[in-house]
Amino acid sequence: ILTGPNPHIGIQLLDELHLLQEILPEVSNMKGVRQPENFHPEGDVFVHTLLCLSKLVPATEQGMERPSFPLAMGVLLHDIGKTVTFEELDRIRFNLHEKVGAYMTAKICDRLKTSNAEKERIIWLVLKHLYFKDAQKMRLNKLKRLFANEGYPELAELCRIDALASSGDLSDYHFCQEMFSKLSHEEIKPKPLITGHDLIVMGLKPGPLFKDILTKIEEEQLDGNLTTKEAALKEVRTLISQMKTVLK
């Protein structure tokens, strides 16, 4: 149903036959969950989801013969957390709906007996589906980590579809795609300048500190601030010195 033509019609038929509530009650519960009209003039969460699904077939023009199952499920479930995070005080809010949705998605995947790889990808898509809206303010290292994930092309498609089915603003999508096209594979996922072995040689004992130091060096490398092993080792010495000062 989801990866074939007209997946939105398939979901509508399941709903009309009262099967959606039996198979995917979480999706059925989207009906009637209102959204702020300035961001979602199309209607409630269920209407938005159907509109997103209707754009899956045109999405095949983006390089895939047909939508992958994880992408289709990601589109179906990306806003599922809104059903339990709806809040209306000064305005309608769905705080942390992506995290709640990822948790709900894991339960659904277990129930549907998807493969572990499919489950992991679908959860990731639901969890990250809001990332593009902050992309233009992100540090380069965070963007590169996003681009390095094998699921990035599917996430880009999900975010494009999500935008088209709501505000229609594709500026964040175009920004990410432009950045992605400008960066080489080596720039997105470069060989680490240093490893844990280098830290051991410097006299450090393996432990939690290792991860903190290596993560910091990786971030600086991805940001373009460190380009050689010598510079990375110098930065490690600086970090160690700073940590010793704090611990005094």
Across the structure, where does each feature detected by a protein language model lie?
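Conserved, hydrophobic alpha-helical core segments of structured domains
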Residues: I1-R160
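Charged substrate- and nucleic-acid-binding regions of tRNA-handling and nucleotidyl-transfer enzymes
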Residues: M64, S68, K107, A163-K248
